[in-house]
A protein has these predicted regions:
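Autoinhibitory N-terminal propeptides
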Residues: 1-86, 93-133
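Subtilisin-like serine protease catalytic core
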Residues: 132-269, 286
Length: 335
């Protein structure tokens, strides 16, 4: 049986090498087809698209009528997409004929997709370093302040193994202070409500979502702040440790930015107050601080002389503080 497979493979490769359609087949597919079964099975990348029954799932760009393509290869199954693209499940033996068919422009093997948090950790070699506990690069003893759209404080990644919160403070600038309900703005500030770890833990013990919201009614409507916090400091409890952030043992401080206009975005006043609160907390508790700012705009001269910029320069020199600004600049004027 093995000999017959070997002979068929040699015949297949002879067809691949003698016909002039190689330019229609992408390089990675050709590499997979030229690999031995042992080599292909040993590689997740080379085997992507192939199945144990000798069929391949491939991406095809074609011209003309879809029906013509289907009629030419009746034993293959096609899913026709917009723009003359198609997904085909085809026998490996028929791939040379598919590539030789004039109506076919190009054939490509599918590629695996990964969660970016995993590939980013792999690219930085962070997992290997963190597994060596002697380095201590887990964020332990570090405070990360996420100034954003809020945080899902009940998410398992932001809780300790005993299900208590990792948050040292949650300042929701959108919730009006209500002293009668035990809700106060942070000392020195007039906006929003500051929730302590004790209040958050009480909310986490609530039996229902409604009861939890009565105690700590802070939510992250867009999910952006939760996403950012997960990348920075998620401990992976929700995924059994599979998807962890960069500093899974750090403490967290979250500020949900408010806005003078309920229908608008926060402005730099709310941002500066959030930074100020975070820095003061870190200095008071003598902990190293990392502030993540994923809010911003392209306004100003970019000279570093606006009051916001000079303020950030100033506070970044207080204590052990690192401010990280991450933006996707989608509105860039042309010269």
């Amino acid at each position: 049986m093995y000999l017959s497979k070997y002979i068929r493979r040699c015949d297949f490769m002879d067809n691949m090498n003698t016909m002039d359609f190689n330019q229609k087949i992408d390089v990675s597919l050709r590499a997979s087809l030229e690999a031995t079964p042992v080599e292909r099975n040993a590689s997740d990348d080379l085997s992507t698209g192939s199945s144990s029954d000798g069929f391949w799932n491939l991406i095809v760009l074609y011209t003309g009528s879809p029906q013509t393509l289907q009629n030419e290869f009746p034993s293959s199954s096609f899913t026709f997409l917009l723009g003359n693209y198609a997904i085909v499940k085809i026998s490996e033996d028929d791939i040379p004929s598919l590539a030789a068919f004039p109506q076919v422009i190009y054939i490509e093997r599918p590629r695996q997709l990964f969660f970016e948090i995993v590939s980013a950790r792999q690219a930085s070699c962070l997992s290997a370093i963190q597994e060596n506990s002697s380095y201590g690069l887990t964020g332990k003893g570090i405070l990360i302040s996420v100034i954003d759209s809020g945080i899902d404080y009940a998410h398992p990644d932001f809780c300790n193994p005993d299900k208590t919160t990792r948050l040292v403070a949650l300042w929701d600038q959108t919730i009006l202070a209500d002293p009668s309900a035990g809700r106060f703005a942070p000392a020195g500030y007039s906006q929003g409500t500051l929730f302590s770890p004790e209040q958050i833990n009480a909310a986490l013990q609530a039996d229902t979502f409604e009861q939890r919201m009565e105690l700590v009614p802070s939510t992250d409507v867009t999910g952006h702040g939760t996403h950012v916090a997960g990348i920075a400091a998620g401990n992976g409890r929700a995924s059994g440790g599979l998807y962890r952030g960069i500093a899974p043992e750090s403490s967290l401080l979250a500020v949900k930015l408010g806005s003078p206009d309920p229908k608008g975005f926060p402005n730099t006043i709310e941002l500066m107050q959030a930074v100020d609160f975070s820095v003061r907390y870190a200095i008071e508790h003598t902990v190293p601080l990392v502030i993540n700012l994923s809010f911003g705009n392209t306004y100003g001269s970019h000279s570093g002389t606006s009051l916001l910029e000079t303020y950030l320069d100033y506070v970044s020199n207080l204590g052990r503080i690192n401010i990280v600004v991450g933006l996707s600049l989608i509105h860039i004027s042309e010269p």
